Amino acid sequence: MALARRNVQPENRDSTRINAQIRITPVRVVSEEGEQLGIIPTEQALERARDAGLDLVEVAPGERPPVCRIMDYGKFKYDKNKKKNSGSSHTKTKEIRLRPKTGDEDIRTKVRQAEKFLEHKDKVQVSVLFRGREMAHIEEGRKVMEQVIEILSEVGKVETKPQQHGRRMICMIAPK
């Protein structure tokens, strides 16, 4: 036995209700331009949206009465996804590890790599690792850290100042 298809809009994946999915009445309506149209029955709000060739989208379901906006739902969904994806854009954290006795040329090599990371909009965690008796000479590690920060100041800015965490001194540098 075949079931008759109803003329119902497909269920959207997110919890945003649109058009006929909004069952509560009355609703507070905001026009496409952003002006308040007041609290009106849902049927009347749907009619206004249809007349404008747009959708009635429930934007604040937790309010009493719920707030609905007359807008193009496809565009709204696209902008929402775009905003969500741009927020978690690309930023990763890369690490360069140094020691208090690291030579100048080795430091420059590590700094060049850190500059590449910063140019690619990644954050850089600079770590100076201390072993054994090096813990008695933390100031040498701080000198190395300050040298790296000074060189990287052109392409990045210090996000967290150098801090001692056990046997490590850590500093975060973000791209400018």
Curated annotation (Swiss-Prot):
GO cellular component, one term: cytosol
Signal peptide extent: none
PROSITE patterns: IF3
SUPFAM superfamilies in the record: Translation initiation factor IF3, C-terminal domain, Translation initiation factor IF3, N-terminal domain
Pfam families according to UniProt: IF3_C (PF00707), IF3_N (PF05198)
GO biological process terms on file: ribosome disassembly
Top-level taxon of the source organism: Bacteria
Keywords: Cytoplasm, Initiation factor, Protein biosynthesis
Predominant location category: cytoplasm
GO molecular function, one term: ribosome binding
Localization annotation: Cytoplasm
InterPro entries tied to this protein: T_IF-3_C_sf, T_IF-3_N_sf, Translation_initiation_fac3_CS, Translation_initiation_fac_3, Translation_initiation_fac_3_C, Translation_initiation_fac_3_N
Similarity section: Belongs to the IF-3 family.
Quaternary assembly: Monomer.
Function according to Swiss-Prot or TrEMBL: IF-3 binds to the 30S ribosomal subunit and shifts the equilibrium between 70S ribosomes and their 50S and 30S subunits in favor of the free subunits, thus enhancing the availability of 30S subunits on which protein synthesis initiation begins.
PANTHER family: TRANSLATION INITIATION FACTOR IF-3, TRANSLATION INITIATION FACTOR IF-3, MITOCHONDRIAL
Protein name according to UniProt: Translation initiation factor IF-3
Source organism of this protein record: Rhodopirellula baltica (strain DSM 10527 / NCIMB 13988 / SH1)
